[in-house]
Amino acid sequence: VTVSKDAAGRWFVSLLVEEEISPLPPVAENVGIDAGITALATLSTGEKIVNPGHERRDRRKLAKAQRALARKAKGSANRAKARARVAKVYARIADRRRDHLHKVTTRLVR
């Protein structure tokens, strides 16, 4: 058992278990993936996977939290709270990005 806490103040517990993993049945068709800038990816079938819309809103929220942090006096309690707020926004961005990529890759595999 491993217990850890991240910068955003969230606690995580990790357990090690043994489990048999059944492989997925093979998919008949192959698909090429081209990572892009305007679209997250373009498949060889012509399908485009769009970037998540929440990314821009989250970046604005992060910029606002960072500006608030920059105005705080070093060593103050308010600065510590502002740092925690920035860490929380970063964690939310990372979580949402990871969730989106997991959903996209799962859809491609199945």
Language-model-derived ranges and their functions:
Residues 3-110:
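Substrate-contacting helices/loops that form the catalytic groove of nucleic-acid
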